A protein has these predicted regions:
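Conserved acidic functional residues
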Residues: 55, 112-113
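Short catalytic micro-motifs in class I SAM-dependent methyltransferases
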Residues: 114-118
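Class I (Rossmann-like) S-adenosyl-L-methionine-dependent methyltransferase catalytic domain
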Residues: 2-46, 52-102, 119-134, 139-201
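A short acidic, Gly/Pro-enriched loop at the edge of an enzyme's catalytic core
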Residues: 102-110
Length: 201
């Protein structure tokens, strides 16, 4: 059984130490690309592992009705401040994605920039259960994950395409999987990743 309090403490410590290389402070270019290419219209949306809220705020600015969840209270405090400055409304949820009991209807669009590739190491089955709870037939799920095709000393956990298809294929049909690069702070090109757009069966 996963110790959810220790997971939250780990991520709070990372934010307290400002050891957050994934937090570029820039809205995800790949998220923008996918929205533009697919024509996903504003709808009820959720970001899993939202961190300091950059992408959740961007979605709200595009007209989405956004909820965003993270286990780090420190990250959420920053996210709330940024949303207030941006003048947008986001429902910020403090909980672990591995044991969250969503209170309302399923979401039509779910965005995940790096949550899946971390959560699967702790408790894949619990993560898939959460995905099942928060989506319904036709819901779209965009997961940006690390890519095992690139060997790096530092960077996100790497996955092979076959792992993604096997694990997420229990619930979703694959609309597209392609390689892309994360953005590091300062606009520097970051690690190689997978951009995975899936549709709930």
């Amino acid at each position: 059984m996963t110790d959810h309090s220790s997971i939250a403490a780990h991520w709070n410590r990372r934010y307290d130490e400002q050891n957050t290389p994934w937090d570029s402070g820039r809205r995800s270019q790949e998220l923008q690309n996918v929205l533009a290419e697919t024509g996903i219209a504003p709808c009820r949306a959720l970001e899993l592992g939202c961190g300091t809220g950059t992408n959740a705020i961007f979605l709200a600015q595009q007209g989405f009705e956004v909820s965003a969840i993270d286990c780090s209270e420190l990250a959420l405090a920053t996210a709330k401040s940024k949303a207030s400055e941006a003048g947008v409304a986001v429902e910020w949820l403090s909980d672990s994605v591995l044991n969250w009991q969503p209170p309302g209807e399923p979401y039509e669009f779910v965005f995940d920039r790096g949550c899946y590739h971390c959560a699967r190491r702790d408790e894949l089955r619990a993560y898939l259960t959460t995905l099942e709870r928060i989506t319904a037939a036709g819901s779209r799920y965009l997961a940006l994950t690390g890519n095992a095709n690139e060997q790096r000393e530092h960077g996100p956990p790497g996955l092979h395409e076959s792992q993604i298809r096997e694990e997420l294929g229990e619930l979703f049909n694959v609309e597209q999987i392609r390689e892309f690069h994360f953005e590091d702070p300062g606009g520097v090109r970051g690690p190689l990743g997978w951009s995975c757009l899936l549709v709930r069966r």
